[in-house]
A protein has these predicted regions:
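Glycine-rich phosphate/adenylate-binding loop and adjacent beta-alpha elements
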Residues: 100-119
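Short loop/turn and low-complexity linker motifs enriched in small/turn-promoting residues
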Residues: 40-45
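Short strand-turn-strand beta-turns centered on an Asx-Gly dipeptide
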Residues: 39, 50, 97-101
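N-terminal mitochondrial targeting presequence
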Residues: 1-31
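Ferredoxin-type iron-sulfur electron-transfer modules in oxidoreductases and energy-metabolism complexes
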Residues: 64-78, 119-290
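Active-site phosphate-binding and catalytic loops of NTP-dependent enzymes
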Residues: 21-23, 77-83
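Short, contiguous acidic and Ser/Thr-rich linear segments
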Residues: 51-64
Length: 290
């Protein structure tokens, strides 16, 4: 065992810090059997109360991801309902609450636990089993106008707008969001003020479009967010960053967005004119969509 002793002075005298570098403990093999406790609900038209149904699953007969186990459960009970699509963490469809944490089932390993609790993501109206109503979430997202707005533009969809590499790098960690709502449904502020607080995902995208050097509607976007609730209900609880399956940092984006809304910071001017290629006769002919 490697032991490193480091001496340092403190206000109350000289202390010693002991550092012990140990190899990580091996994961205990608990066998292939898992007991899945799954939330079941037949829908709002049913008069039955929600229940927890237990499934004994041999995970050695399916893949390693939670979604594989969910598909295995559906083979056992075809009435079990959930959303899925890409199976690669791109579409954001399979968001669930696993062992009390939000995640994407397709990129989350089956826990090394005998009992696995599987619920729909919280603070959403449940339509059936693990399927929730995403209408309110996407209404908030659409309200931030998630697209480039130009005051001076040519024929829509026929020309591309220029952007420097430095300006493009500002959006790294923002445009990777897949709108799975894991962050929003893990946020207590969104639970408490869901009707007016836009939530981490929508605010992350709002910041992404505001700092985009190709967008020309910055002032109106910021004006729309100057509200006591839309952005400033964020209390930096950090659940959004903790539960983001893509490893993004919505709380950081919201903090920077607040500086722009309050006027403490200004949007930087673009390194190049985004429409300069559209004004060039030679380039417009090359960029035109045939």
């Amino acid at each position: 065992m490697l032991r490193i002793y480091k001496w340092h002075s403190e206000l109350r005298g000289i202390g010693r810090i002991f550092y012990s570098h140990k190899p990580p403990a091996p994961v205990k093999d608990i066998g292939p059997r898992r007991v899945f406790k799954v939330y079941r609900f037949e829908g709002i038209d049913s008069r039955k109360e929600p229940t927890i149904q237990t499934f004994d699953v041999d995970v050695s007969t399916c893949g390693k991801m939670v979604l594989d186990a969910m598909i295995k459960i559906k083979d056992m009970d075809p009435t079990f309902s959930f959303r899925r699509s890409c199976r690669e963490g791109i579409c954001g469809s399979c968001a669930v609450n696993l062992q009390g944490r939000n995640c994407l089932a397709c990129i989350t390993l089956i826990p090394q636990s005998k009992v696995v609790n599987l619920y729909p993501i919280p603070h959403m109206y449940v339509m059936r089993d693990l399927i929730v109503d995403m209408t309110h979430f996407f209404n908030g997202y659409n309200s931030i106008r998630p697209y480039i707005i130009r005051k001076t533009q040519g024929p829509i969809g026929q020309y591309q707008y220029a952007q420097s590499m430095r300006d493009n790098l500002k959006m790294i960690g923002l445009y990777e969001c897949v709108l799975c709502s894991c962050c929003a449904t893990a946020c207590p502020s969104y639970w408490w003020n869901g009707r007016r607080f836009l939530g981490p995902a929508s605010l992350l995208h709002a910041y992404r479009w505001i700092i985009d050097s190709r967008d020309e509607d910055t002032e109106q976007r910021l004006k729309d967010l100057r509200d006591d609730f839309k952005a400033f209900r964020c209390h930096t609880i950090m659940n959004c960053t903790l539960d983001c399956p893509k490893g993004l940092h919505p709380a950081q984006a919201i903090a920077k967005l607040k500086l722009l809304i309050s006027g403490l910071q200004k949007k930087e001017n673009p390194d190049m004119d985004p429409s300069r290629f559209a004004s060039s006769g030679d380039w417009t002919q090359k960029c035109k969509i045939k």
